Structures are given as C-alpha cells and as structure tokens.
Amino acid sequence: MNRLLRLRFKLKMKKPDFIRQEAHRHKRLGEKWRRPKGRHSKMRLKWKEKPPVVEIGYRSPKAVRGLHPSGLEDVLVYNVKDLEKLNPETQGARIASTVGKRKKIEIIIRARELGIRILNISEEKQEELLKLAEKQEAQEVNETNE
C-alpha cells in the first residue's frame, strides 16, 4: 500500500495540468478541461507542440485511487454517531463544512477516544479548539457558582 501511495505521488508530480483548448487565447474560456472535438483540432490529433490531452495512462493505481495521501479512505462526518461507524485502521474522518464549532469539538473529543484521524483539521487547530472548549467550560462553571 505504501509503495503504491509513493508511486501515485510520483505520477501526480509528472502529470501535466490539462487545460481547455484555446484557454490561453480567450479570456471568456475557463481553464477547466473540455475534450477537443473539432474536425481540424491539432490538440485532438495530439500534435507534439500542443497541450497534452487527458488519457488513461495518467491514472493512478486502482488500489490507492481516491484515497487520502495518508492512505486512509476519506469519510464525511456530520455528527458523533457517524464517527462511531468508522474503522480507525482504514478510514479517516473529514468533518463537514456545515458543522458548527460546538459539535466539531464533540467530534474531535470522540475521535481521539476512538483513535480515528481527522483529515481536514490539523493537530494544532484541534488542540486550539479543545483549549477553547476547556476555557468556556471553566467560564460556565464560574458563572453558575456566582
């Protein structure tokens, strides 16, 4: 698996940026890939000096296709219940963008208990959120005591 991940990384480094035909010439054309279909299209005919065309040979190995660079399968998580369905050895959690700060903190705490890696929040940011949660808890305790 690690060998295939390293191979995929090397292949991705070699892979050119596939841009739409004539995208450099007209501002109104975005760079998003569109297959050239014109009858006289030099790009479709794969002329040497024209930009490269998407081909199957640029594809990554099937075993690691679609995986996170760490080798874990990327699973979108909305709440703690979703998190408990994951296998920590093969899957990693990606917290959805619509999840708020309070629920995000709950998910981080539970993920640490279960040994699940969160893929879209760095360790530093997780620590920062947990410290913020502790600070808020201490503040709430002080308010209830007064």
Swiss-Prot record:
One GO cellular component this record assigns the protein to is: cytosolic large ribosomal subunit
In terms of PROSITE patterns, this protein maps to: RIBOSOMAL_L32E
| One GO term (biological process) | translation
- Write the record's keywords in alphabetical order, separated by commas: Ribonucleoprotein, Ribosomal protein
MF terms from GO for this chain are: structural constituent of ribosome
Note whether Ribosomal protein occurs among the keywords: yes
Looking up SMART domains in the UniProt record yields:
Ribosomal_L32e
Tell me where on the tree of life, at the top rank, the source sits.
Archaea
Q: Which PANTHER family match?
A: 60S RIBOSOMAL PROTEIN L32 AND DNA-DIRECTED RNA POLYMERASE II, SUBUNIT N, RIBOSOMAL PROTEIN L32
What family does the database annotate? Belongs to the eukaryotic ribosomal protein eL32 family.
Name the UniProt record assigns to this protein: Large ribosomal subunit protein eL32
> What is the species listed in this Swiss-Prot or TrEMBL entry?
Methanocaldococcus jannaschii (strain ATCC 43067 / DSM 2661 / JAL-1 / JCM 10045 / NBRC 100440)
